[in-house]
Amino acid sequence: MAHQSHAYHMVKPSPWPLTGALSALLMTSGLAMWFHFYSTTLLTLGLLTNTLTMYQWWRDVMRESTYQGHHTPPVQKGLRYGMILFITSEVFFFAGFFWAFYHSSLAPTPQLGGHWPPTGITPLNPLEVPLLNTSVLLASGVSITWAHHSLMENNRNQMIQALLITILLGLYFTLLQASEYFESPFTISDGIYGSTFFVATGFHGLHVIIGSTFLTICLIRQLMFHFTSKHHFGFEAAAWYWHFVDVVWLFLYVSIYWWGS
């Protein structure tokens, strides 16, 4: 291994950004093909390419950080700034959906009947499944914090237990959300109410699935003794992301389910 006189990680050439871009092209093209021609070939190919890219890219990052020691304190600091900027970009992403919702609901047009929810729309009861979903996500926020504290105290067993509980709560939330969609009295094509509801809650649901995957990777890494109380940014980033998902849901619940109904 060549001598290095600085603390920064000079990343070697990697094919994964290219295969990741290719998978994104295949998935977006595949979605268009699915919507218009009911063909899922491109979409399936895109999902497969994306899964393989993620697996191999994460494998490389884990090798560089855990086994090769490239993630020095200055590198970890840069990764922290990167994660903060990423979550900030996600905040603005969801801000667009809330803007669309409030723009339509605070001044409903005559086409909507002059009131909100629009004529003919029966909104979901915010005190039923949505309230249960809120409780589930708040509980998962508590359990992920428990996992973090356990890791800082080198309590391996409790960390694994708390992380597993968080993942199970995330899966339970996803199942509840899916059942709510199936039983919903309106669809995404039911005007501005249906489109804003399903796009905002659907993208949040996608983020819950991504967060659950992120935490599952962290659980596997913890089982393989990858994390210590001093070296665990992968888990810390997952915890930040999960708390962000929790906060977004609280805004969704108050805005769309409770006030919007």
From Swiss-Prot:
GO molecular function: cytochrome-c oxidase activity
SUPFAM superfamilies, alphabetized: Cytochrome c oxidase subunit III-like
EC number(s) from the headed UniProt entry: 7.1.1.9
CDD domains: Cyt_c_Oxidase_III
GO biological process, one term: respiratory chain complex IV assembly
Family: Belongs to the cytochrome c oxidase subunit 3 family.
Purpose: Component of the cytochrome c oxidase, the last enzyme in the mitochondrial electron transport chain which drives oxidative phosphorylation. The respiratory chain contains 3 multisubunit complexes succinate dehydrogenase (complex II, CII), ubiquinol-cytochrome c oxidoreductase (cytochrome b-c1 complex, complex III, CIII) and cytochrome c oxidase (complex IV, CIV), that cooperate to transfer electrons derived from NADH and succinate to molecular oxygen, creating an electrochemical gradient over the inner membrane that drives transmembrane transport and the ATP synthase.
Protein known as: Cytochrome c oxidase subunit 3
